[in-house]
Amino acid sequence: MPLKDCDQPPELSIPPTFWYRSLVAAGLYCPEVHGPARYWLTVEGSFTRALQQKCQERFHVEILREGFSTPTPEEAKRLNLAPRQLAWVREVRLCGDGRPWVLARTVIPQTCLHGHGRRLRNLGNKPLGAYLFSSPEWQRGPLETGLCKARSNGHPRLARRSLFHRGSCALLVGEYLLPRLYQSPNRG
């Protein structure tokens, strides 16, 4: 039987999020309570690869939207962009075994879209992580932990993000965990 695209309510989207420098600063310091979520919030290396290892059948990326857009004021500040400066914004669902596990949002300043950076606009359904972690030019900065303003059950409550640098270019990658990812008994 073929796998369907992700089943999810259409209103599921990237929620407003409060960002912290660490799990402890976000109040996620109790392993007994936050253990499975902590695992996903602290995965080192490629998050995409960790999700692929969790899959029993198939991992895929669904594009929700991508194109030039204005980053949020907080994202612009994090990337040192002028207010209302356009950037390439990509929002996707990362799905495993036919179910959405993660919403991801990437903000890429226009200055990073030249030369090798042109590939970032043409990823299609390929995971961004596969590109970033296959290129030694890209270096990841520290992970930040996000507490999301969840709209209802099933919406992201936790997130992680980091800056990736290549020379003077930086892009911001946020991964918003859907509860079914860390409530599942199989972490990977």
Swiss-Prot record:
Any single GO CC term annotated in Swiss-Prot or TrEMBL for this entry: cytosol
Catalytic activity: chorismate = 4-hydroxybenzoate + pyruvate
MF terms in GO: chorismate lyase activity
Coiled-coil ranges from the UniProt annotation: none
Pfam families per record: Chor_lyase
This protein's UniProt keywords: Cytoplasm, Lyase, Pyruvate, Ubiquinone biosynthesis
Chief location bin: cytoplasm
Transmembrane segment boundaries: none
UniProt record, GO biological process: pyruvate biosynthetic process; ubiquinone biosynthetic process
InterPro entries: Chorismate--pyruvate_lyase, Chorismate_lyase_/UTRA_dom_sf
Cellular localisation: Cytoplasm
UniProt pathway: Cofactor biosynthesis; ubiquinone biosynthesis
The enzyme's E.C. designation: 4.1.3.40
Function: Removes the pyruvyl group from chorismate, with concomitant aromatization of the ring, to provide 4-hydroxybenzoate (4HB) for the ubiquinone pathway.
HAMAP family linked: UbiC
Record-stated family: Belongs to the UbiC family.
Name the UniProt record assigns to this protein: Probable chorismate pyruvate-lyase
Organism encoding this protein: Marinobacter nauticus (strain ATCC 700491 / DSM 11845 / VT8)
Gene that specifies this protein: ubiC
